[in-house]
Design a protein with these regions (language model features):
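Cell-envelope and extracellular/periplasmic
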Residues: 1-175
């Protein structure tokens, strides 16, 4: 779930993971701090960050050998899981008044990550490619309407960025 525009949970340690060459060191720069670890024999690394408070957008830089990964516009706020069937999958763009709602959406308050529907019987640590998007502009139309209206109601009350992780698939069992 790591991409530009992602939202991380405030006031809690956050886990950042990656993969690389076994035995190679990893330097992670985030929120004015440096974290170091080593890629394990399975080719994976993990860093637990310190808890952070909301503030200006941040950047994450991970460096391992000649490889550098940069993640921009990282927000610290509240992250919510939005899971369900057709009622959660129904998008803002499906409403008759979608264009009016699109004009009212406040840019910079909420972002979302929609997990692609993927049926696989073999467990995997990797997710199909997706990215965090703003809950405004043209991207708003693809967002779950239930998730959007929840964020629209909650964000002004708590006053921090909202991250919505949407996992919705019509006609499937919730478990």
């Amino acid at each position: 779930l790591v991409s530009d525009h992602m939202v991380l949970q405030r006031h809690k340690p956050n886990v950042l993971k990656g993969s690389g060459v076994p035995g190679r060191s990893v330097l992670l720069e985030f929120a004015g701090k440096e974290y170091r670890t080593v890629v394990n024999q399975g080719g994976h690394w993990r860093i637990d960050t310190e808890p952070l408070s909301p503030g200006e957008p941040r950047q994450i830089v991970a460096i391992s050998g000649e490889d550098t990964l940069q993640v921009n516009d990282v927000r610290i706020g509240d992250v919510w899981i939005c899971s369900g069937q057709s009622n959660m999958e129904f998008s803002v763009g499906s409403f008759l008044w979608a264009k009016e709602e699109q004009k009212k959406a406040v840019e910079g308050d909420s972002w979302y990550y929609t997990l692609p529907n993927n049926l696989d019987l073999i467990p995997s640590d990797e997710l199909p490619a997706s990215q965090w998007k703003a809950a405004s502009g043209n991207d708003l139309l693809q967002l779950s309407a239930t998730a959007y209206f929840f964020a629209k109601h909650v964000q002004p009350e708590i006053g921090v960025p909202i991250g919505l992780i949407v996992s919705a698939w019509s006609g499937t069992a919730i478990e």
